[in-house]
Swiss-Prot record:
The gene is rzpR. GO terms for biological process: defense response to bacterium; proteolysis; viral release from host cell by cytolysis. One of its GO terms (molecular function) is peptidase activity. Encoded in the Rac prophage. Its EC number is 3.4.-.-. Keywords: Antimicrobial, Bacteriolytic enzyme, Hydrolase, Protease. InterPro entries: I-spanin. This is Putative endopeptidase RzpR. It comes from Escherichia coli (strain K12).
Length: 99
């Protein structure tokens, strides 16, 4: 009985991890393909054209560096994994060790 409970618990959290990884991979692919945007709070330095008499600033578009974008998705994936592992360990302790 106990072994079956532990196996079910493991299967539940393994599936949740796989689902979270698939969601993160899909989001990464969508951002890379331009189907979705990754919104961050950013400030761009304005570039003033010397010939512009109206005083309108032309701001460069903010964009994450490729390495920063990869790091973001790696961090997101690791946070999801850590959270699922922690929740699984807590549930295991509650259901199996504290009975």
């Amino acid at each position: 009985m106990r072994q079956r409970d532990v196996a079910a618990l493991d299967a539940k959290y393994t599936k949740e991890l796989a689902d979270a990884k698939a969601e993160n991979d899909a989001l990464r692919d969508d951002v890379a393909a331009g189907r979705r945007r990754l919104h961050i709070k950013a400030v761009c330095q304005s570039v003033r054209e010397a010939t512009t008499a109206s005083g309108v600033d032309n701001a460069a578009s903010p964009r994450l560096a490729d390495t920063a974008e990869r790091d973001y998705f790696t961090l997101r994936e690791r946070l999801v994994m850590m959270q699922a592992q922690l929740e699984g360990a807590q549930q295991y302790i509650t259901e199996q060790c504290l009975k």
